[in-house]
């Protein structure tokens, strides 16, 4: 049986209801009020955005959700896990600073931020995945697992490997610790089309693990032993010389060994 999907557009034909009030009504209509949150820790999982990036949900939406949680006696907190790649969210201190710069403060959202996998991204819980095909034991940020109630507050976006990312990515990849993310990316390691590479070294500058190397001809190659499959190099290559093996050979029957 298909699930009911509730939708609200951005139109506000009446001054009596703004967009935040509309979101609150949408959530209550969908059954939010039936969830027992009294005295419970409620994780609101979202993406705080990299510094300089505008493609994230505004803090106003987080406040609407947090206020509803508190109205039902819950203790909300915003959360996300650290990233594999270079940027403003690789450790908890930088991650929280990035969130504050982008407006996610306790005063604007009505609740605090907890980076789920800790200071260095290694505070995790191993969660068995029954019937897991690629990952049989997922490494999840501890604060996510410690929460009593979990809410996914997701923005829709394009993705270099998957085409687009939404709620499943926000939870599946976003709740993974740094090691958990590495395992999920493991089958998607990139390679360089030598004839397209111009030796600009953009890939080397963005890589946090020193995977790109350059030969006498100044052409890049990827050291797969060092590569974690985060795909940041794909995004920065100006000539699209770096491509993902899992996308090029997606129709081939070979699959990576499951990670236990």
What are these regions (language model features)?
Residues 85-165:
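An acidic, phosphate/nucleotide-engaging active-site surface
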Residues 34-45:
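N-terminal glycine-rich anion-binding loops that anchor highly charged ligand groups
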Residues 74-77:
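Residues at the starts of beta-strands that form the adenosine-phosphate
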Residues 3, 7-14, 50-58, 228, ...:
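Metallocofactor- and cofactor-centric catalytic cores in central/energy metabolism, strongly enriched
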Residues 55-72:
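Histidine-anchored nucleotide/phosphate-binding helix
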Residues 12, 177-235, 241-251:
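Ferredoxin-like iron-sulfur electron-transfer modules
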Residues 248-260:
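Single conserved hydrophobic/aromatic residue that forms the stacking wall/gate
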Residues 1-33:
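N-terminal basic/disordered segments at the start of proteins
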């Amino acid at each position: 049986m298909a699930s009911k999907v509730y939708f609200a557009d951005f139109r506000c034909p009446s001054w009596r209801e703004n967009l935040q009030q509309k979101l609150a009504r949408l959530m209550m209509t969908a059954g939010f009020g039936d969830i027992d949150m009294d005295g419970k820790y409620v994780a609101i999982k979202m993406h705080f955005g990299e510094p300089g990036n505008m493609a994230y949900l505004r803090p106003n939406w987080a406040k609407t959700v947090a206020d509803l949680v508190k109205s039902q006696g819950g203790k909300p907190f915003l959360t996300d896990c650290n990233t594999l790649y270079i940027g403003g969210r690789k450790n908890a201190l930088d991650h929280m600073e990035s969130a504050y710069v982008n407006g996610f403060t306790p005063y604007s959202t009505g609740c605090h931020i907890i980076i789920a996998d800790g200071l260095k991204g290694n505070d995790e819980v191993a969660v068995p995945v029954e019937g897991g095909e690629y990952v049989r034991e997922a490494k999840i940020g501890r604060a996510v697992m410690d929460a009593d109630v979990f809410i996914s507050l997701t923005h829709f976006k394009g993705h270099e490997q998957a085409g687009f990312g939404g709620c499943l990515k926000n939870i599946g990849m976003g709740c993974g610790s740094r090691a958990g993310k590495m395992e999920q990316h493991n089958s998607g390691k990139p390679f360089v089309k030598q004839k397209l590479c111009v030796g600009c070294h953009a890939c080397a500058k963005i890589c946090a693990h020193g995977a790109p190397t350059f030969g006498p001809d100044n052409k890049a190659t990827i050291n797969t032993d060092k590569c974690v499959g985060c795909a940041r190099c794909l995004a920065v290559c100006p000539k699209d010389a770096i491509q993902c093996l899992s996308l090029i050979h997606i129709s081939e029957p070979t699959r990576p060994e499951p990670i236990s």
